[in-house]
């Protein structure tokens, strides 16, 4: 009887062998690991780097109006030492300073020089206007061997005013300049500190010297400080330069009685530019928007780990050398053991015997899309990508990199650490602030990428679930889920039928009658097979009972005939 039941079950199963369609996603043998908010080292099919590490060791100047100052320092273009004669007026949107560049010829310094340097780097170049000062009773041709052209000379944009004769009286003078332009004027003047009191008397006469400068927003008095100093360029004296930005229609006035280095022309800024100090070679064959001391950063990535002091349209500097952004779904490759099992089970159970669909494993080789189908029917086996769900995921993921760039990119200004002693505290604050910003953005970068990665993985899982639900709603009672991402179909489903499931045009009513009949047969087989163990145990029990009954009957007959005696002892 058991044999009959087993044969019946096998026969019924063979008769109603179901066609099958499975859903899965693309997988690769070696994915890329990314970090999310909740987990580190999750493997995904695709990922892209967000931190640029490649540097172009040149200044890419193609398409730029570039000026290479060479031996001229940027501040020197405003006062005119001999090395800056060709740069007294210029126009540029990329200004290159070199380490060999010098701002001065006669020893001295600029007050608040870094602020002025930043103004000039962004200036787009400078143009000049004569201030119209005239002088009587003094010499205007002071010169020095420290500023040589063909012979001793002086700053081209300044006048060194001296007494008419050595040790002669320097008259009290007042000069004013009104800015009639529509943009601010850069006004620069100097104070000469002689190498000794005797030298000061020789140049400007005896007595205390005082220079006063004022405008509507500025007022300052200066007294020269003569005295011996170490010689530089053969000079023990110093010239300190001061400056102000004079608003339109405002007037600056100078009152002095010696030791005054007078401005000859006012400077006006032309527009906007980038300025960088670098010794990298200029290259007119490449384009760039982000520069640093070592060259150019050409990148569409949101972050860079090349130089924390890059300027221009630059990726944000972060401490991390790599931050991978997921652009594909979670990768669950078929390992070697799984592949061997798949091959073994295919021989026994067909294409889907060991494939666990999107729940346990992806499908390697699904190159036409992220999500897809595999089917098995009387016509054979096949695989197809689902373009709609794939495109839906891609549309939402595309632009992640651009969104990160929008959140992080901005113009950066470079503040060098060329501070004098008075400015060192300011320099320390700037450096501390820069370091703090790097720390904050390094954390922000890691957080932003982790958030996007979490969203990508959740999104791709969601699209997979949507695809699965779409198939389930179409098939309804015509198929049964096997828990592994597959549906056993209870009717004959040829390739056109499979295509209709993929295209969301499947008509479940068309196959309903056949599916119900086949489902009843399969359910009957499952029901009968379920009682097999019960029947086996019942047969075993009945056999034991029959054997015991026969033994008792034989014993009774033997006792009755005297062939067996039973003695009970107490």
From Swiss-Prot:
Biological-process GO terms, alphabetical: clathrin-dependent endocytosis of virus by host cell; fusion of virus membrane with host endosome membrane; fusion of virus membrane with host plasma membrane; viral budding from plasma membrane; virion attachment to host cell
Subcellular location: Virion membrane; Host apical cell membrane
One of the Pfam families matching this protein, by short name: Hemagglutinin
UniProt keyword Glycoprotein, yes or no: yes
Main location, first listed in the record: virion
Lipidation (S-palmitoyl cysteine): 566, 569
MF terms in GO: host cell surface receptor binding
Cytoplasmic side: 555-570
Site (described: Cleavage): 349-350
GO cellular component: host cell plasma membrane; membrane; viral envelope; virion membrane
Protein keywords: Clathrin- and caveolin-independent endocytosis of virus by host, Clathrin-mediated endocytosis of virus by host, Disulfide bond, Fusion of virus membrane with host endosomal membrane, Fusion of virus membrane with host membrane, Glycoprotein, Hemagglutinin, Host cell membrane, Host membrane, Host-virus interaction, Lipoprotein, Membrane, Palmitate, Signal, Transmembrane, Transmembrane helix, Viral attachment to host cell, Viral envelope protein, Viral penetration into host cytoplasm, Virion, Virus endocytosis by host, Virus entry into host cell
Cysteine disulfide links: 22-486, 60-286, 72-84, 105-147, 290-314, 493-497
Membrane topology: Single-pass type I membrane protein
Transmembrane regions listed in the UniProt entry: 534-554
Glycosylation sites: 30, 46, 249, 335, 431, 503
UniProt-listed SUPFAM superfamilies: Influenza hemagglutinin (stalk) (SSF58064), Viral protein domain (SSF49818)
Signal peptide: 1-18
The protein's role, per its UniProt record: Binds to sialic acid-containing receptors on the cell surface, bringing about the attachment of the virus particle to the cell. This attachment induces virion internalization of about two third of the virus particles through clathrin-dependent endocytosis and about one third through a clathrin- and caveolin-independent pathway. Plays a major role in the determination of host range restriction and virulence. Class I viral fusion protein.
Note: Major glycoprotein, comprises over 80% of the envelope proteins present in virus particle. The extent of infection into host organism is determined by HA. Influenza viruses bud from the apical surface of polarized epithelial cells (e.g. bronchial epithelial cells) into lumen of lungs and are therefore usually pneumotropic. The reason is that HA is cleaved by tryptase clara which is restricted to lungs. However, HAs of H5 and H7 pantropic avian viruses subtypes can be cleaved by furin and subtilisin-type enzymes, allowing the virus to grow in other organs than lungs.
Family the entry assigns: Belongs to the influenza viruses hemagglutinin family.
Subunit text: Homotrimer of disulfide-linked HA1-HA2.
Protein name in the entry: Hemagglutinin
Species, as recorded: Influenza A virus (strain A/Equine/Switzerland/137/1972 H7N7)
Gene responsible for this protein: HA
